[in-house]
Amino acid sequence: MTERALSRLEVPAPAPKPRNAGMTMFTDLGCGLHEQEDRMQIAGDFVDLAKLATSMVSTLPKEIIRKKVELYRKYGVEAFPGGVQMEHALYAHGMDIADYVFEEMKDLGLRVVEVSDNYLDLTLESKCKLIEKGAKEHGLKILAEAGDEVEETPLEALIHDCQSCKEAGAYKVLLEAAELMDKKTGELKMHYLDAIKDAVGLEHIIFELPWVWLENVHWYQSFSSLAVMVKKLGPEVNLGNIEMSMLVYAQMIRNGAGTKLAKDRQV
């Protein structure tokens, strides 16, 4: 067992991998292998999934992608391609290209693939067929994104999206961060968190944190949303889009000993 300082404080150790709850996903925007190794040496125990951003898989050489996948797996972290990669392929070549893409991902050593419909006008039925194809025909774990990055989805429709993805065989449902934010106030829509948790099941969802690429989102929203979600849903909530430099900090929040926690404690 790893020895930590201040052992009398009894800070909880992360659950052993593979985990089904308390999972952390972050986005790799193209860091080099040395930086990747450094990050994982420090934070690998706390991380479960690493998204290879957008179309990285078709942008970098195969040998680099394979090395990144292997290096993450060394620390018990599964890399996966962002959903834009599949969306771009479908847009350029049609639905029949999906089998080729899934097999190419497996050839790169990937075991997890994201299916999304952020930029491609896929029907829910088509998205679910892709999920089923990837999971049942190709033996992959499919992360299915639910929600829209631009348009606000009514709560009932968003829940239906999540449930449909789960029933189609999704490993986890990635809940689009933009759907969780009130576009006027920038605050989290707390009633969405409760309703989706109750209807779909906390263990089936990865709640994405808002990132600065969303309109009117600044670091404050991403930073504070992390603490709010953990306080609201508990330390076992699955979280996505953690900034790479905040992986250790996210674990501190899960442990109940980070900043941005409510001042409602007494000594």
Model-based region annotation:
Residues N20-E35, A53-S58, F80-I97, L143-A157, ...:
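Active-site mouth loops of central-metabolism enzymes
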